[in-house]
């Protein structure tokens, strides 16, 4: 058997199926397109679901892919075993109502034996126990000996998820030999030992399972095969671990160099090295596909993987950010097959670095919180940290349990690991439920799915704002009806419509539909499946029936304002790329009649100078009166024109190209002005961050821009009037006022501090002796927390021995400060525990060390009541 590299196997597979007249589809992004049932693409067939269900038409009846996938369900096992990984590539061949079992099995056998050159006697096959057809193909056409064809039950060899398309499958196994065997005479595929490795699953989707559990034959059966690239590479390279495959080994070696460690040194080191290697690959691909770190959804998955890898770097002794430097190794290894990694290399590296640096801060934050909690435990004479708190540190702050245990051991403390594991299991169960609930979501039907697939809509809104259309369907309360009447809110599908459906960030059109005695208000328009456009209608008068011909008219002003903003968005996108950098990618947009919102990839806020440059450039192109033209072209032709495609968007063979002069070329299905001069004026309102590595610009055009400028002018005139200053002198006058105010505030603070210090001797007269310990409690009027601490420290020096509890009002809130001398702390006094009870009465909380603590409260009127309990708290602490 010839030894082959992973990249070589990938190319060989795709070339083989291209020869078999399959359309070779580049890997879809890891972010599912229009599929809310999945967080991330986790299987080769996942992006093709709509082709299997018939909702969308595939580019060819035969397809082949090498699909990027992410699975994190078993993340805790990654690193601990040699086969678990979060990122993997799935080779797949598919047929939609074309060839079936015979060709699928024959070509699978041909590729495995002739192209991969696997020994025939090493390959076994399994079939579903009731699938005599597949068994017969293996026995009679492939001529595989009966003893190497295994019949397995539904659990192993029948693919189904709830209701919908399903069918039997046949799997190819590679026999690794006796040394991996369990030793039993009946050892064969299906055994739990490591001898037989399943490497290629052929699913024959020939049934449609209904709600009653019946398996109905599909009129056009499908083929769905999947072969894990890393797994077959293990076979071809005769290695036991995916981390020994050539591509993974290259990354792992660079991790060893960066961490100054050796692989196979010890178990703990191996686990950390594997985790870093796997997670580095995953995060590079995820960021390359437009995912950014966040606290929810797929962004949280990315953040967790990145921080987990960074944490294992710390366990190996790495004290600074290092993952971003290793990313180049992933690009070197996979860049030939995935060009986006090369194109976005600098951007991916920057995002990793920013997130890594943030994690360093997080570790420090978690450490502070843990240390504070340890002090509280000491005060309560506790020596075991509850597992729920440890899990909160882990889950919320990314603070690892290993580090928590290590810190506790230094204080001769432990953590309740069983309680921690219980919380971890609860989280796993939540994740499993989310996954199991989501897996079938994409196959569920609604009233629209039940409609005839020939019901489609032709959009006429590019050419006209008014068009006649025939009512093909009416949906009322998720039921298909033939008739509806005044007062109802329904969704209708027309054969022709001028109403643009919400798509590509542009909101749907509004307007009216009418005929004779009937009138309806179009509240919204959305894109449905199968080239249908849904109009959301409120029936104002009359009756509407399926089959009626009606007039539809789009409200002109909102549409034209939306077009202004949409074309301006294209100009903005181009200006950002030119001024900020080519790494800028659209990460989201919203185009309404009132404003535009544009989210884009960039790792830091834009300076005022850069924003001014962007705004100026867009306005210059508006003044240049550029013609806006649209052309239909093939995807390849559009790319040759230099058209900007939206990353992650799913495009067909033919696309619509929007050209704004020679300045901007984008793939876009939206509506636009005819000439850039129609936009009028472009004005940026704000630039903010919405997530790590994602910035947002909000802007207005046309009349909205004019009205905004007039409002701003009005405000400036009012300020000029108040300050009795005109024009250019306004800024200077405001600076003078701010300087004067700052100086007055400083003088006021100095006076307050002086008065407070002058009254210290008077305050010392209020000392009481409780159980042989000095106690000084005082309620000031208004003092900042900083002043309260300074006064407390001064009193502490003067008192020599004892406890000081102070309260004051600051910014309409209560502030408390408690401090105790060392000798009193040794008697059992704990300032942090004391102040927590005090602050509760004023509607707040806080804590701190035994010798010093501060807290706040929402109710300043309760400061005196809160301070009144200090005497009792001190007695309790002194008496143990």
Curated annotation (Swiss-Prot):
Q: Predominant location of this chain?
A: cytoplasm
According to the record, cofactor stoichiometry and binding are noted as: Binds 1 zinc ion per subunit.
A Gene Ontology molecular function term for this protein is: tRNA binding
Q: So what does this thing catalyse?
A: tRNA(Ala) + L-alanine + ATP = L-alanyl-tRNA(Ala) + AMP + diphosphate
Q: What is the top EC class of this enzyme, as a single word?
A: ligase
Pfam short name (any one): DHHA1
NCBIfam families to which the protein is assigned, alphabetical:
alaS
Q: What does this protein do?
A: Catalyzes the attachment of alanine to tRNA(Ala) in a two-step reaction: alanine is first activated by ATP to form Ala-AMP and then transferred to the acceptor end of tRNA(Ala). Also edits incorrectly charged Ser-tRNA(Ala) and Gly-tRNA(Ala) via its editing domain.
| Notes concerning its domains | Consists of three domains; the N-terminal catalytic domain, the editing domain and the C-terminal C-Ala domain. The editing domain removes incorrectly charged amino acids, while the C-Ala domain, along with tRNA(Ala), serves as a bridge to cooperatively bring together the editing and aminoacylation centers thus stimulating deacylation of misacylated tRNAs.
Write down what this protein is called: Alanine--tRNA ligase
* Species in which this protein is naturally found: Alkaliphilus metalliredigens (strain QYMF)
This protein's encoding gene? alaS
